[in-house]
């Protein structure tokens, strides 16, 4: 069994809980997700099954769309509503002030990840240190925010929709917005609406997956071809195939656009590659 599942994660369980349940339903151990959702968060979670786990990093790199709610005026240690309140500064914020602040975060920016995260520093996961009351300096990360739309705002409670790159923490974005406003802000709800081209409309609940597997219905498993929208390229000869599989650069006869491609040999999918200089094929994921 192999492929990719678009899960609609419910609130109150971890991403690992989702994987554990799927292993039980599908009776397979080779399953992995492509981006953690906190227990508070709901929404789209891409899960790789079987050989598809080799391609997880490419899926993780896709842009994501979130809808987030937050309160302005206080901070917690986790930057979300489930943490301990550590600071408060109630000020009146107008819709115009908030909209001006949001504009400052659009584009290529630097972001410091939260202490309560799975990022490792010197071999230690940050959330393990945070639970011991230890705070360490975290290096800034380069992220991109394509847009932030203010959906609702009343009485210092806001709802936004935003499209972000890999590595962006919405909790940190909201905290930073609060800082820019001269106060604090804390995330109260989060929904991942979309990962790449896959949205809630394409997703399945865990209950649906369980019922479908009991009926031997596996249509929820998407193929690699369905998930990756990269153009297809067929290697022409056995020599090209061997060079590719051994990790060597393949010089092809055609002039192609410099971008990522799905690579096939004898109509069988064998991995992903970048085209450079229009005719140099360099594999980076092998299936």
From Swiss-Prot:
NCBIfam families: TruB. One of its GO terms (biological process) is mRNA pseudouridine synthesis. It catalyses: uridine(55) in tRNA = pseudouridine(55) in tRNA. Pfam families: TruB_C_2 (PF16198), TruB_N (PF01509). It is an enzyme of class 5 (isomerase). SUPFAM superfamilies: Pseudouridine synthase (SSF55120). Responsible for synthesis of pseudouridine from uracil-55 in the psi GC loop of transfer RNAs. One of its GO terms (molecular function) is pseudouridine synthase activity. This is tRNA pseudouridine synthase B. The active site is at 38 (nucleophile). Belongs to the pseudouridine synthase TruB family. Type 1 subfamily. Keywords: Isomerase, tRNA processing. PANTHER family: PSEUDOURIDYLATE SYNTHASE TRUB1 (PTHR13767:SF2), TRNA-PSEUDOURIDINE SYNTHASE (PTHR13767). Its EC number is 5.4.99.25.
